[in-house]
Amino acid sequence: MVVNKTTAVLYLIALSLSGFIHTFLRAEERGIYDDVFTADELHHYRINERGGRTGSLAVSGALLSSPCTLVSNEVPLSLRPENHSASRGAPLMLRLAGCGDGGALQPGKRGVAMTVSGSLVTGPGSGSALLPDRKLSGCDHLVIHDGDTFLLCRPDRRQEEMLAAWRKRATQEGEYSDARSNPAMLRLSIKYE
C-alpha cells in the first residue's frame, strides 16, 4: 500500500497537534504554586471549615504584622503588696485588641483561644535602668473571653522595686515627654504558638 506524501504529512501534523493539545490541557497539574500564609485567624478558620487545609498551623520566623495591638500605650502600675506572694509582685494587665473575635470564633466556649509567651523588655541602648539582660518578666497566656482580651505579666519583687524607683524618678524628672529617647521605657515582646 502506497501512502501519498501529502497524506503522511497531514497525519504527522495531526499527531503533533494532538500531542501539544494534550500537553497544554494537562499543564495545570504540572504548575507549582506557592502556598502563602496570611497572618489572619479568620482566614485560616474559614479555610478549615470549607474542608481545605486542616491540621495544626505551624508558623516560624518573625511575623511582619502582629494580629494584636495594645489598647493603650499607658499601663497602670499597681505596686500594692497585699494579696501577692513574697516572690511575685502585682500583675501588670495589658489590654489587647485585634487578637480575634473571642466567642464569635468558638460559640459557647470560654477559655484560651490563642496561646502566647512573651515578656516586657526595656528599650534599646546599653544604659538600661531596669535590667541588664533586658527581660523584665514572663507573661502568662493570652486569654480571650468573648472578645475581652488581656495578657498578664508578673514581675518578681526585685523587678517591681526597680519599676517603682524608675516611676518615681521619671515623674520627678519629667521623662514621660519623649518615650523614644528614654531607654527605660517598656516594650512588649510576644511569641505566637
Curated annotation (Swiss-Prot):
Pfam families for this protein: PapJ
Keyword Chaperone: yes
Disulfide bonds: none
An example Gene Ontology CC term for this record: periplasmic space
InterPro entries per the UniProt record, alphabetical: PapJ (IPR029224)
Keywords, sorted A to Z: Chaperone, Periplasm, Signal
Record-annotated membrane-spanning stretches: none
Subcellular location(s) per record: Periplasm
Domain of life: Bacteria
Signal peptide residue numbers: 1-27
Role description: This protein maintains pilus integrity and thus is an important participant in pilus assembly. It may function as molecular chaperone directly or indirectly in the correct assembly of PapA subunits.
Protein name stated in the entry: Protein PrsJ
Gene giving rise to this polypeptide: prsJ
